[in-house]
């Protein structure tokens, strides 16, 4: 990007941006929730739309001069509805967390009981963690995975639902590598007359391309972020049945937000447009191929994968048999140029600041053009670094840098 003005006005900040640019360029990015946006997305984000206040919704604003940003928001909403075949879309949430908060506030009262996936089993902070607003404002109870299969225990979920009769069941996850059976969860919701909400932030790209079954036909509400597999700007969105549209919109504004970020909404429109193209489907198919190959190679090196493998874009790895914690593995791999995050595993025995595992994903490296052969090399680099962690790993770091040079960010720019 052109930083001519920033170079003159704030070289100190520009230096920080340049260092981050270099880190992204020469590191293998395996954090499952991260991706690289297109230059088009960044151009929209950096546009003068950031100057415009637009409280309210298209054609019902509290400010004048909104006729063109109305067009932008309408375009984003229509593209999102088309992408997921949804009845209503709200593109104003600043984040996935705020999208979730708005759904809760739209139909529930403070203190209502909600059933969500346990954070340590793969859920999310906003699905009831006691340190999060969700756990503080609502009476969350949790379901998890089966100890043997490490996949969602739907029998346990149903049993807990029947015993506690929550007002809402939340599904979706931040560290779950398998297909989620939304139809089965809908049946449980119907049995207890509960709302069904799905947080598809991680798998939105897989859903959009038909690789993962869509929650939209089953759920009353579907929330997502726009910056993970959707490869857009950092932000959130909500899909819902038309009958909940007014309640959801009111929960966002004036409920929990003021003016929407019109430059971000424009960038969301760009990414939704990109996701509607055929090449995006090919990209998502390659993401899954890459993840499966990476998983199999890691298994060949003796790594234990939670649930034995993956159906989506991520892998959850138990490092116990490698005699290294998630925290130490994250630091070690970062030192050679592989970025991962420490992660709790089901039935975790260590602190969430230490963890027994790491979570990795392939959306970002697949965006760069990495394919199956590169996945085999990544598995080798990870295994070698962990097995030889007391040795000098400078040669591994150099090999990683050379691979990154072969697949530059925005190579077609």
From Swiss-Prot:
Annotated compartments: Cytoplasm
Annotated binding of (6S)-5,6,7,8-tetrahydrofolate, by residue: 119, 123-125, 351-353
Superkingdom per UniProt: Bacteria
Cofactor(s) the protein requires to work: pyridoxal 5'-phosphate
GO cellular component entries: cytosol
EC top class, as a word: transferase
Pathways per UniProt: One-carbon metabolism; tetrahydrofolate interconversion; Amino-acid biosynthesis; glycine biosynthesis; glycine from L-serine: step 1/1
PROSITE patterns for the chain: SHMT
Gene Ontology MF term list: glycine hydroxymethyltransferase activity; pyridoxal phosphate binding
Location, primary (coarse class): cytoplasm
A family per Pfam: SHMT
Enzyme Commission number, as recorded: 2.1.2.1
N6-(pyridoxal phosphate)lysine PTM sites in chain numbering: 228
Residues in coiled coil: none
Keywords recorded for this protein, A-Z: Amino-acid biosynthesis, Cytoplasm, One-carbon metabolism, Pyridoxal phosphate, Transferase
Keyword Cytoplasm among UniProt keywords: yes
Gene3D superfamilies named in the record: Aspartate Aminotransferase, domain 1, Type I PLP-dependent aspartate aminotransferase-like (Major domain)
Recorded catalytic activity of this chain's protein: (6R)-5,10-methylene-5,6,7,8-tetrahydrofolate + glycine + H2O = (6S)-5,6,7,8-tetrahydrofolate + L-serine
Positions bearing the site annotation: Plays an important role in substrate specificity: 227
GO biological-process terms attached to the record: glycine biosynthetic process from serine; tetrahydrofolate interconversion
Function: Catalyzes the reversible interconversion of serine and glycine with tetrahydrofolate (THF) serving as the one-carbon carrier. This reaction serves as the major source of one-carbon groups required for the biosynthesis of purines, thymidylate, methionine, and other important biomolecules. Also exhibits THF-independent aldolase activity toward beta-hydroxyamino acids, producing glycine and aldehydes, via a retro-aldol mechanism.
Family assignment from sequence similarity: Belongs to the SHMT family.
Assembly and oligomerization: Homodimer.
Protein name (Swiss-Prot/TrEMBL): Serine hydroxymethyltransferase
Organism of this sequence: Clostridium botulinum (strain Okra / Type B1)
């Amino acid at each position: 990007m052109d930083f001519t003005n920033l170079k003159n006005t704030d070289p100190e900040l520009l230096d920080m941006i340049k260092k981050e640019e270099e880190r992204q360029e020469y590191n293998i990015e395996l954090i499952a929730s991260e991706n690289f946006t297109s230059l088009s997305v960044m151009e929209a984000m950096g546009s003068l739309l950031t100057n415009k206040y637009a409280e309210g919704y298209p054609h019902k604003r509290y400010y004048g001069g909104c006729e063109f940003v109305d067009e932008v928001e309408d375009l984003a909403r229509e593209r999102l509805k088309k992408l997921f075949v949804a009845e209503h879309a709200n593109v104003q949430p600043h984040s996935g967390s705020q999208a979730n908060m708005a759904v809760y506030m739209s139909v529930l009262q403070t203190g209502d009981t909600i059933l969500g996936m346990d954070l340590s089993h793969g859920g999310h902070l906003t699905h009831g963690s006691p340190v999060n607003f969700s756990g503080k404002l609502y009476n969350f109870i949790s379901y998890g995975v089966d100890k043997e299969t490490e996949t969602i225990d739907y029998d346990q979920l149903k049993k807990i639902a029947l015993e506690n009769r929550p007002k809402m069941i939340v599904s979706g996850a931040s560290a779950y590598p398998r297909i989620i059976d939304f139809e089965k969860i809908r049946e449980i919701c119907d049995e207890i007359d509960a709302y069904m909400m799905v947080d598809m932030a991680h798998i939105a790209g897989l859903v959009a391309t038909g690789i993962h079954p869509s929650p939209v036909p089953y759920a009353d509400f579907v929330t997502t972020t726009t910056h993970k597999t959707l490869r857009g700007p950092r932000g959130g969105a909500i899909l819902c049945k038309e009958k909940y549209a007014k309640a959801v919109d009111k929960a966002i504004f004036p409920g929990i937000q003021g003016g929407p970020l019109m430059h971000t909404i424009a960038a969301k429109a760009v990414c939704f447009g990109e996701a509607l193209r055929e090449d995006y489907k090919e990209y998502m198919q390659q993401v899954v191929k890459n993840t499966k190959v990476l998983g199999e190679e890691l298994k060949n090196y003796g790594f234990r994968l939670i649930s034995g493998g993956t159906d989506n874009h991520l892998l959850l790895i138990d490092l116990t048999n490698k005699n290294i914690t998630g925290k130490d593995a994250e630091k070690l791999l970062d030192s050679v140029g592989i970025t991962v995050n420490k992660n709790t595993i089901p039935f975790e025995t260590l602190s969430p600041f230490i963890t027994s595992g790491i979570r990795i994903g392939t959306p970002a490296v697949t965006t760069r053009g990495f394919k199956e052969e590169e996945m085999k090399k990544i598995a080798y680099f990870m295994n070698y670094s962990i097995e030889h962690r007391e040795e000098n790993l400078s040669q591994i770091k150099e090999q990683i840098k050379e691979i990154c040079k072969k697949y530059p960010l925005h190579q077609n720019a």
